[in-house]
């Protein structure tokens, strides 16, 4: 993507809550804001065209 590898790791190595879209740690099992357990890994590719 053109960023430094350290920045890529910090920005993209996250989990996203499917209910409230909060960013969570990669090792999280529940959302830190709402407690929901359905977390997805953040997309590594941008959605833009």
From Swiss-Prot:
UniProt KW Iron-sulfur keyword: no
Pfam families in UniProt: Ribosomal_L40e
GO MF term list: structural constituent of ribosome
Family note: Belongs to the eukaryotic ribosomal protein eL40 family.
One GO cellular component term: ribonucleoprotein complex
InterPro entries: Ribosomal_eL40_arc, Ribosomal_eL40_dom, Ribosomal_eL40_sf, Ribosomal_zn-bd
Keyword Protein biosynthesis: no
GO biological processes: translation
Protein name (database record): Large ribosomal subunit protein eL40
Top-level taxon in the UniProt lineage: Archaea
Residue runs in coiled coils: none
Alphabetically ordered keywords of this record: Ribonucleoprotein, Ribosomal protein
SMART domains from the UniProt entry: Ribosomal_L40e
Originating organism: Methanosarcina barkeri (strain Fusaro / DSM 804)
